[in-house]
């Protein structure tokens, strides 16, 4: 047999892309438009994400991966603690995922300023939207709200949008 594997995930299996990035934005792009039904669109996004997440969880369990719904803390060269329990391992791989980065701009703590995670967790029509960051998620979110009729401005420090793409 192979190695035994445990996956510590305090949020949701699938990470940023599945839960708060690529997948929800693609589902939004598919359904957004003038006069779109935002509650129905939000329900469809959740249905798509939940279905794919359940599929990932099923695949992981079928492969023998133990899913542990806690944040892990490495406490030694071969020890991880999570949820009040200690786990021993010959090898520890840290794949910490990502969070939206906040640039050092005064005023980002003002009410109404949200990260992409916040925007995706509160889907609703907007008249105007300023997006700081012209990466993939920023551009996709801009397209969603523009398609729904919002006036959208993207602010990007690089000379062009999508600066990490060729």
Question: Where are these predicted regions, by residue range?
Answer:
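Alpha-helical scaffold segments in soluble metabolic enzymes
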Residues: 27-30, 44, 91, 144, ...
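Short intrinsically disordered, low-complexity coil segments enriched in acidic
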Residues: 1-6, 35-42, 87-89
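Rossmann-like dinucleotide-binding cores of NAD(P)H-dependent redox enzymes
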Residues: 47-53, 57, 120-121, 126-130, ...
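Conserved N-terminal glycine-rich FAD pyrophosphate-binding loop of Rossmann-like flavoproteins
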Residues: 11-32, 160-166
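FAD-binding core/adjacent interface of flavoenzyme oxidoreductases
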Residues: 6, 13-23, 50-132
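Glycine-rich active-site loop/strand segments that organize a redox cofactor
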Residues: 25-47
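Alpha-helix C-terminal capping segments
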Residues: 1-2, 28-32, 80-82
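Glycine-rich FAD pyrophosphate-binding loop
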Residues: 1-16, 148-161
């Amino acid at each position: 047999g192979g190695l035994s594997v445990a996956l510590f995930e305090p949020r949701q299996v699938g990470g940023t892309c599945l839960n708060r990035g690529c997948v929800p934005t693609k589902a939004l792009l598919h359904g957004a438009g003038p006069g779109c039904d935002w509650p129905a669109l939000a329900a469809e996004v959740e249905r798509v994400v939940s279905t794919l997440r359940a599929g990932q969880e099923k695949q992981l369990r079928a492969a023998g991966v133990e899913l542990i719904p806690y944040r892990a803390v490495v406490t030694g060269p071969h020890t991880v603690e999570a949820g009040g329990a200690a786990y021993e391992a010959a090898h520890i791989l840290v794949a910490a995922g990502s969070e939206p980065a906040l640039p050092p701009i005064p005023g980002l703590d003002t009410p109404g300023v949200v990260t992409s995670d916040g925007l995706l967790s509160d889907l609703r029509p907007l008249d105007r939207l300023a997006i700081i960051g012209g990466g993939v998620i920023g551009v996709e979110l801009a397209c969603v709200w523009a398609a729904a009729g919002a006036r959208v401005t993207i602010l990007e420090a690089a000379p062009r949008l999508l600066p990490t793409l060729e």
